């Protein structure tokens, strides 16, 4: 209640939630967004299954304006789990196209989240140690592996992989991509001084720790084109 005893003026209502929204070339039927939520139902090679398609189709049919499909690894070494979706290979495009088509057929806009798990990956899944900004065990994974520190060359390969993944998403028919830089995954690890102890151009200062984010965003924009919407989940 306002100091005068009057209720503060409402600038929006729940009714706005159901009104259309247009931005960045996207036209949403409403403002309801399904965020990326891992379903854990991909094939062992990371490809899309009927269960994943049905899972997202139902949410789109329920009325979501935008469906952001669950995190999908851009490199095999960035895989978080054995049942995670992948966008690391052209072989994934066929299944991804079925998924995007199913979402769009129900009237929703379809986006795909691109990710690399960093040290939140596991040697049990990968068959090798995970890779991260520094050889530091992730605080979210106290029993996890101590990762290998990425070399500058491997960082460049990772940046390029995000660009490759964005092209695959676009070719598969997705309307947008989201870069996953949250939840303690690789890009989030680079940003935090707890997990980034580097003293080179990719560490040491906030400017250095955020360098890879700028490079990934620039590469995705370069590869996907100027008119393709890009979201960034930062955390």
Regions found by a protein language model. Name each.
Residues 1-13:
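Short, Lys/Arg-enriched N-terminal segments with co-localized hydrophobic residues
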Residues 14-36, 103, 221:
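N-terminal amphipathic alpha-helix/helix-capping segment at the start of soluble metabolic enzymes
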Residues 34, 59, 63, 103, ...:
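Conserved, mostly hydrophobic/aromatic
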Residues 85-110, 194-230:
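Alpha-helix-loop-beta-strand connector modules within alpha/beta enzyme cores
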Residues 68-93, 114-127, 178-204:
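Glycine-rich, proline-tolerant flexible connector loops at the mouths of alpha/beta enzymes
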Residues 115-174:
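Non-globular sequence segments
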Residues 53-75, 171-176:
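Catalytic domains of carbohydrate-active enzymes, especially glycoside hydrolases
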Residues 31-33, 66, 109-111, 176-178, ...:
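Structural preference for beta-strand elements that scaffold enzyme active sites
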């Amino acid at each position: 209640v306002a100091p005068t005893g009057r209720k503060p003026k409402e600038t929006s209502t729940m009714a706005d939630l159901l009104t259309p929204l247009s931005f960045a070339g996207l036209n949403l039927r409403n403002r309801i967004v399904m965020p990326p939520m891992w379903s854990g139902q991909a094939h062992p090679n990371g490809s899309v299954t009927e269960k994943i398609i049905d899972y997202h189709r139902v949410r789109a049919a329920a009325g979501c304006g935008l469906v952001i499909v669950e995190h999908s690894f851009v490199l095999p070494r960035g895989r978080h789990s054995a049942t995670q979706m992948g966008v690391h290979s052209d072989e994934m495009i066929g299944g991804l196209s079925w998924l995007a088509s199913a979402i769009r057929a129900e009237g929703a806009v379809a986006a795909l989240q691109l990710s690399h798990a960093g040290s939140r990956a596991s040697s049990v899944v990968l068959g090798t140690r995970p890779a991260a900004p520094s050889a530091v065990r992730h605080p979210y994974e106290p029993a996890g592996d101590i990762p290998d520190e990425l070399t500058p060359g491997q960082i460049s390969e990772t940046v390029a992989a995000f660009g490759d993944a964005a092209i695959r998403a676009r070719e598969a028919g997705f309307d947008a991509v989201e870069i996953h830089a949250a939840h303690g995954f690789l890009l989030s690890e680079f940003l935090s001084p707890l997990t980034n102890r580097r003293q080179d151009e990719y560490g040491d200062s906030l400017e250095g720790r955020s360098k890879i984010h700028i490079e990934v965003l620039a590469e995705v924009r370069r590869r996907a084109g100027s008119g393709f919407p890009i979201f960034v989940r930062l955390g």
